């Protein structure tokens, strides 16, 4: 049955926070000015998940909602995020680090594509060269550039980088709330105890204790409370517990220690630790498996790592997975009310912003009249997107580390079928667009592209040098000559492409 919102009088949003206020601002633009948009600022717990690292679709989300970037930077204490630094994931000791940079335009290695792959990148892989050093802006990291220096290089358009930001959740929320109120959004502080449904299963009203607030369309941004899908509609939960190993986290702050435009992700004995540098502090946390450590053990390991005491601000249970259906009739859940994954790669933020973009797109393009098939398409694409997130995050744990029980058991664990199939392909060639196509559809965009997969799979050895050599041998003679010239410039050697053995040094 279609959803007809042409006569809607009120849009109700449960939960403030970043997700609730972003949804309110987006829907305020979609609906006519005489339609009331109300945010019920019920207490929420991490509606966008822990961690302060932005995703690549953050800036698009800000621009689409006409949010001033400079004001956001000031009020959210935002700092540039140009990629992720991974330490100790390969178990090779020091220095064991690699980067996933946010590569943009103007990079020959990324812009040169032949037959579905990137031959110049494959040449670097075959030659054993780092991938991140092909990005001109990587110098910003090596020289520990200031925010001003980063701004200056990005303004030239020659950095080869696409920026995002680390941000303070509370500051970002305050900014969104101020903008939302200025744009006529109504705010109420109340606790939502339940929802009244009509005989079609549509939400008619929020139950606020002694009163009801009637609504025509409802958004759940209540965070881990999950008032809609979890308590009213009893939607099936699709768990990632057998794929993604962490189920607990401690969250803490560190003193700032110089400029760093990357999120740091450090592999630990029973999980991994993140550091997101902000203006006045470093937001940090340790996501770990309760099978191998408890909170006290995690804090002790963190303190041993840094050499000073650390105070945990929060201890969280991480139930990773998603609800099989996010949009039910006139109700949709966003953020952690819809699903959750650990803060690795800021994947939850990326998914939330993409889900909101598609909700807005469907409502706007349909002029408030939404066919059932569009809702089905949204739910199907949402599920595919979550599966892509799961598989991309699982790639990060596909390590050769076996130095602790956590890593030994991971190395022996069964892989999900989809990722296992991709992994088999990556043993023979580099990741390609056809590999990630199954994760998108119905207007949704991919959260992680081929370059992202390559940037993680190659350093971990999931894509071996021999795989890059093999696909280079399949190039035409002309293309191979161009690649050979690139390699000669790259290494200043007489490395050759052999028709039988790949690269020779």
UniProtKB/Swiss-Prot annotation:
Q: Which Gene3D superfamilies match?
A: FAD/NAD(P)-binding domain
UniProt keywords, alphabetically: Membrane, Plasmid, Transmembrane, Transmembrane helix
Q: Which Pfam families does this entry report, sorted A to Z?
A: Trp_halogenase
Single GO molecular function: monooxygenase activity
Where is the protein localized?
A: Membrane
What membrane topology is given? Single-pass membrane protein
- Annotated membrane-spanning segments are 11-27
Which InterPro entries is this protein grouped with? FAD/NAD-bd_sf, Flavin-dep_Halogenase_NPB, Flavin_halogenase, Trp_halogen
- GO cellular-component terms in the record? membrane
UniProt xrefs under PANTHER family: FAD-BINDING PROTEIN (PTHR43747), FLAVIN-DEPENDENT TRYPTOPHAN HALOGENASE (PTHR43747:SF4)
Q: What is the official name of this protein in its record?
A: Uncharacterized protein y4xG
């Amino acid at each position: 049955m279609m959803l007809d919102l042409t006569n809607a009088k009120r849009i109700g949003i449960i939960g403030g926070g970043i997700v609730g206020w972003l949804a309110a601002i987006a829907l305020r633009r979609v609906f006519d000015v005489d339609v009331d948009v109300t945010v019920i600022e019920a207490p929420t717990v991490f509606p966008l998940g822990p961690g302060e690292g932005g995703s690549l679709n953050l800036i698009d989300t800000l621009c689409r909602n006409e949010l001033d970037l400079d004001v956001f930077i000031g009020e959210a204490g935002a700092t540039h995020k140009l990629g992720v630094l991974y330490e100790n994931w390969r178990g090779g000791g020091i220095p064991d680090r690699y980067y996933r940079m946010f590569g943009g335009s103007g990079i020959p290695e990324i812009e040169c594509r032949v037959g579905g792959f990137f031959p110049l990148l494959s040449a670097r892989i075959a030659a054993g060269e780092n991938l991140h050093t092909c990005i001109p802006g990587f110098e910003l990291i090596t020289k520990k550039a200031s925010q001003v220096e980063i701004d200056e290089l990005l303004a030239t358009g020659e950095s080869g980088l696409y920026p995002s930001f680390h941000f303070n959740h509370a500051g970002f929320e305050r900014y969104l709330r101020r903008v939302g109120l200025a744009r006529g959004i109504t705010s109420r502080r109340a606790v939502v105890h339940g929802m009244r449904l009509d005989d079609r299963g549509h939400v008619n009203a929020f139950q606020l204790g002694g009163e009801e607030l009637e609504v025509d369309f409802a958004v759940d941004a209540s965070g881990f409370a999950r008032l809609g899908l979890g308590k009213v509609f009893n939607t099936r939960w699709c768990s990632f517990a057998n794929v993604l190993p962490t189920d607990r986290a401690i969250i803490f702050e560190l003193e700032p220690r110089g400029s760093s435009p990357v999120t740091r992700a450090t592999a630990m004995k029973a999980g991994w630790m993140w550091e997101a540098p902000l203006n006045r502090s470093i937001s940090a946390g340790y996501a770990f498996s309760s099978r191998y450590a408890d909170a006290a053990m995690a804090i002790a390991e963190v303190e041993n790592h840094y050499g000073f005491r650390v105070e945990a601000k929060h201890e969280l249970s991480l139930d990773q997975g998603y609800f099989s259906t996010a949009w039910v009739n006139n109700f949709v859940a966003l953020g952690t009310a819809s699903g959750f994954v650990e803060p690795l790669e800021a994947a939850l933020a990326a998914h939330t912003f993409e889900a909101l973009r598609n909700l807005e797109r469907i409502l706007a393009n349909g002029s408030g009249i939404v066919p059932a098939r569009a809702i089905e398409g949204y739910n199907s694409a949402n599920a595919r997107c979550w599966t892509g997130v799961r598989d991309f995050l699982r790639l990060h744990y596909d390590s050769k580390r076996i130095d602790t029980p956590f890593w030994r058991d991971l190395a022996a664990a069964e892989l999900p079928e989809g990722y296992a199939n991709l992994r088999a392909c990556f043993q023979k060639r580099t990741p390609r667009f056809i590999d990630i196509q199954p994760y998108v559809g119905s207007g949704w965009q991919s959260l992680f592209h081929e370059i992202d997969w390559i940037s993680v799979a190659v350093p971990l050895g999931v894509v071996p040098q021999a795989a890059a050599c093999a696909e280079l041998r399949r190039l035409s003679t002309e293309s191979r000559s161009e690649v050979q010239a690139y390699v000669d410039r790259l290494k200043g050697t007489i490395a050759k492409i052999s028709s039988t053995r790949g690269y020779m040094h």
